């Protein structure tokens, strides 16, 4: 629990709808269903919290670079994809892995994973025809994101969303050049698909207590974009690094949250027991600061190199506990 109690701006508080964002998200629902748009709606007029989404853009962060990055992202989003080749190439696994390695080396993205698309990941009312989804990761610069919730931290998030938009288009255009149609998806708008579940399925890591994916290399300090395609690429697998159990015993992000939005235990959301961040508590602070990312900035996994050492430490501990159990049986 944060020592300072956050009190929302009355002008913003007056815009909250009667329905809770947690209700829209399915908090407490025991039956599985698709997600519904709760924020970052493609059309604010079509979501209950649309007035709050519009209010977000009235806040002046005090940095001219915000507008510059937004303009640059708009240019990327409006740019045409590469042409679709008439002949379809069969992309060998080695060719895909070489493309990924080359793209990472030049900074187009920092990580990629592939998994079969699950229709449950699409928002209600959205039908996805493609069979596979490629998830791309874009790591924050540590020295910038650690400034959150200062405007510089939010600016770093925006820079990575710019990279995410560009990276998704690069991958989609590469696939189209091989004759495979591909559709790029990028934030911060919700788009067609919720990206965290496919990121978990594609081996990006595990869900953290703060509601973000924690990766051994990047911590939770990265953004996502995606590409939908029918191209039969080699799929990745989920990974258990002991992160979930670590979060159960860690209270760093929970204690740092200025709105007490991070719960100490898992909750049921649309039929799944998982870590969940209280939307109604999180949003006002997020809006008034043009973003937040405090939970990501304080996460023990955030520092470069720390996550990989933690994974090794947790693995050794698990082996030791398993040996003790064997000896006791």
Give the role of each language-model region.
Residues 101, 110-320:
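Catalytic cores of enzyme domains
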Residues 1-116, 128-129, 301, 305-329:
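Iron-sulfur (Fe-S) cluster-binding modules
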């Amino acid at each position: 629990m944060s020592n300072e109690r956050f009190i929302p701006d009355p002008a913003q508080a007056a815009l909250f709808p009667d329905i809770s964002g947690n209700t829209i998200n399915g908090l407490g629902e025991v039956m599985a269903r698709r997600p519904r748009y709760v924020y970052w709606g493609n059309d604010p007029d079509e979501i209950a919290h649309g007035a709050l989404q519009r209010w977000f853009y009235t806040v002046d962060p005090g940095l001219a670079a915000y507008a510059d990055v937004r303009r640059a992202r708009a240019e990327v989003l409006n740019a045409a994809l590469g042409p679709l080749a008439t002949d379809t190439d069969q992309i060998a696994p080695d060719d895909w892995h070489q493309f990924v390695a080359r793209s990472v080396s030049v900074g187009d993205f920092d990580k990629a994973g592939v998994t079969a698309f699950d229709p449950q990941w699409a928002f209600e009312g959205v039908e996805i025809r493609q069979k596979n989804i490629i998830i791309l990761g874009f790591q924050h610069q540590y020295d910038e994101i650690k400034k959150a919730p200062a405007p510089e931290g939010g600016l770093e998030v925006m820079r990575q969303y710019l990279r995410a938009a560009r990276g998704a288009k690069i991958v989609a255009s590469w696939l189209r050049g091989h004759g495979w149609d591909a559709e790029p998806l990028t934030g911060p708008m919700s788009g067609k698909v919720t990206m965290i579940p496919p990121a978990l399925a594609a081996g990006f890591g595990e869900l953290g207590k703060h509601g973000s994916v924690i990766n051994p290399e990047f911590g939770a300090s990265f953004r996502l974009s995606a590409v939908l395609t029918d191209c039969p690429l080699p799929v990745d697998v989920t990974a258990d690094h002991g992160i979930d159990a670590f979060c159960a015993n860690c209270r760093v992000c929970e204690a740092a949250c200025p709105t007490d939005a991070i719960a100490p235990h898992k909750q049921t959301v649309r039929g799944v027991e998982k870590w969940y961040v209280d939307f109604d508590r999180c949003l006002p602070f997020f809006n008034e600061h043009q973003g937040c990312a405090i939970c990501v900035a304080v996460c023990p996994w955030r520092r470069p190199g720390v996550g990989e050492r933690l994974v090794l430490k947790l693995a050794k501990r698990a082996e030791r506990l398993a040996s003790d159990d064997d000896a006791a049986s």
